[in-house]
């Protein structure tokens, strides 16, 4: 996958039209004609509107507040959520994935995961519950990012390097990987570790700050083996 350049992300956010998207369910007669910028599912005196608050608000001025319901979860948002309908991956309810994220085949995104703009998730990699992938974080193939783990994001400054996690890596629950750190292929990061330096391939690190405690051996491989069946679609 091609890495999304930081400056491109900055330009995308800076130049995007900021949106306060709302859904409005109403009864009665609206004040004025519904503009084409609004999705309109209405009959003569009842309907549902989808659009930007600045476009919809004037239409409600003639209604009693008891006659409409506004649903809204963002204000002046610069980045929409990713359209996930056709992604060849398992994405569970409650995951928050912003636009400009790349998700490879057979990846798994669990409930409550938060994945920011520019992040990349490799083939058959699992992002567990509540994990956070910051801007531009890159995870390779067949890895596991544990529940509550954080891969720190780097969008600004534009010259900063993102977190990069290799293939076949296991990152334990609630571990934190600091900006710019690289995790080598086949490494294991212990639960709760705070990783401030690069991790060599095929090593185990743990602690705060994380330090190498041993090389990967057969016993470790057996204890940390990932299950392919969880990644099948």
From Swiss-Prot:
Pathway per the UniProt entry: Amino-acid biosynthesis; L-lysine biosynthesis via DAP pathway; LL-2,6-diaminopimelate from (S)-tetrahydrodipicolinate (acetylase route): step 1/3
Coiled coil regions, renumbered to chain: none
A Pfam short name: DapH_N
Keyword Transferase: yes
Sorted UniProt keywords: Acyltransferase, Amino-acid biosynthesis, Diaminopimelate biosynthesis, Lysine biosynthesis, Repeat, Transferase
PROSITE patterns in the cross-refs: HEXAPEP_TRANSFERASES
Disulphides: none
Superkingdom of source: Bacteria
Family: Belongs to the transferase hexapeptide repeat family. DapH subfamily.
Full protein name: 2,3,4,5-tetrahydropyridine-2,6-dicarboxylate N-acetyltransferase
Species assigned in the record: Oenococcus oeni (strain ATCC BAA-331 / PSU-1)
Gene coding for it: dapH
